[in-house]
Regions:
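Residues forming the flavin
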Residues: 1-148
Length: 148
């Protein structure tokens, strides 16, 4: 290889998802969003855009920065329910919470109807299994455009 020749894959990078409320420069590990495999991630349109459970977290956390950067306004929202509390390292910033999906959609300024549809379709497609958040398990969805 000659000096200055391109190397690697320019479409790939090691980039983690961080809380958008973190400091502009280097929020550090305390701003990394680790809840991704325990819920869903939606874009500004309220739609999922990748399989959140493709692999268990220690192997896949570094792809989410790139995936979110490819979304409109480079924003994604990791959404979990109360069952996920305590199963991941929270960011230093408190989570946004709501008793309703509509209320959450208003807080994050995305279309409530789209978010509700995404969550309803996801929940309806869920196939129960033996849950283990530390390894690939047999919990999944079936019949979605992007299955988990």
């Amino acid at each position: 290889m000659d000096r200055g020749d391109p190397a690697g894959d320019p479409d790939q990078c090691h980039a983690v998802a961080i809380d958008g409320r973190a400091p502009t420069y280097d929020g550090g590990i305390v701003s990394r969003v680790d809840s991704v495999p325990l819920g869903i991630v939606v874009n500004n349109a309220g739609k999922r855009f990748f399989d959140e459970g493709e692999d268990f977290w220690p192997k896949r956390y570094a792809i989410w920065g790139r995936l979110i950067a490819a979304q409109t306004d480079q924003i994604g929202y990791a959404i979990t329910d109360a069952k996920a509390d305590g199963l991941f390292m929270p960011t230093v910033l408190p989570p946004l919470k709501s008793k309703t999906i509509d209320g959450l959609a208003k807080q994050i300024d995305i279309p409530a109807a789209a978010l509700l549809q995404t969550i309803d379709q996801f929940n309806a497609a869920t196939i129960s299994g033996s849950f283990n958040h530390q390894a690939l398990d047999d919990c999944r969805t079936q019949g979605l455009l992007i299955n988990k």
